[in-house]
């Protein structure tokens, strides 16, 4: 704890609240959830891929007419921050549409999947094996039958019901490449935290259309629990059309290469 270079308030909170008053419970709790441990090989792979994709992104950015900061100098500072944090520069020439509920997002996504010509990449934290989840699977099956390359990555905990269903096998039989992010198994529990999950919600079609936001592949009734007076989640997504979709595709490809055996190269 003292050697982990955590912020001083965080270190003091662990010491004062748990470790000093109840040493055994405190040490056990810290070992369980105190450190963000993803496994050394995973961290090293992520760093290596991040560096590689960042270099390719720089070449892409400099090779095209993407730098708009000379025209909007007041945004140059925040653009630099975004580039450092996200490993991709802000890109101009995009059309954005807000999809304020699950129905509109799922309908638009299925329509774009049905119109896909080359590739579809999807990464979601929660993918339910019912309703909208089945509809998206059916759309991916149609796309794969047309010769579109499809890759699907879901979180091992958030999408556990989907993973245990027959839908992943349906996708594989249709020719869709499927992988599980941060899979849970007894060996991994010894060396990495299983509560650290991949919460991303990304879909990219043909490298030009992308979806992101808070909406998972679920119906609008997801999370509705009337007995405890909890209503359904109200999520929103953004549909992006333009070069910014490629930045989201880089995020997907980086995660995909870590979780699958496929090396995509360029």
Question: What are the roles of these predicted feature ranges?
Answer:
Residues 1-266:
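N-terminal localization/anchoring segments of enzymes in phospholipid and broader phosphate metabolism
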């Amino acid at each position: 704890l003292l050697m982990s270079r955590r912020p001083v308030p965080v270190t003091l909170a662990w010491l004062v609240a748990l470790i000093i008053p109840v040493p055994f419970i405190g040490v056990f709790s810290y070992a369980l959830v105190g450190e963000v441990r993803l496994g050394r090989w995973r961290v090293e792979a992520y760093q290596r891929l991040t560096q590689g994709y960042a270099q390719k992104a720089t070449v892409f950015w400099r090779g095209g007419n993407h730098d708009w900061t000379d025209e909007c100098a007041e945004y140059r500072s925040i653009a630099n921050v975004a580039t450092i944090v996200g490993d991709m520069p802000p890109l101009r020439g995009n059309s954005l549409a807000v999809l304020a509920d699950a129905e509109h997002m799922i309908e638009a996504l299925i329509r774009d999947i049905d119109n896909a010509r080359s590739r579809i990449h999807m990464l979601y934290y929660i993918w339910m094996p019912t309703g909208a989840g089945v509809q998206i699977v059916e759309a991916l099956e149609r796309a794969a039958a047309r010769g579109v390359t499809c890759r699907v990555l879901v979180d091992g905990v958030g999408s556990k019901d989907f993973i245990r269903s027959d839908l992943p096998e349906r996708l594989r039989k249709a020719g869709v490449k499927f992988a599980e992010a941060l899979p849970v198994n007894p060996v991994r529990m010894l060396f990495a935290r299983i509560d650290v999950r991949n919460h991303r919600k990304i879909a990219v079609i043909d490298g030009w259309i992308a979806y992101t936001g808070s909406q998972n592949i679920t119906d609008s009734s997801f999370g509705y629990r009337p007995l405890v007076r909890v209503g359904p989640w109200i999520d929103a997504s953004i549909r992006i059309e333009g070069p910014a979709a490629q930045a989201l595709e880089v995020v997907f490809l980086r995660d995909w290469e870590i979780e699958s055996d496929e090396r995509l190269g360029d």
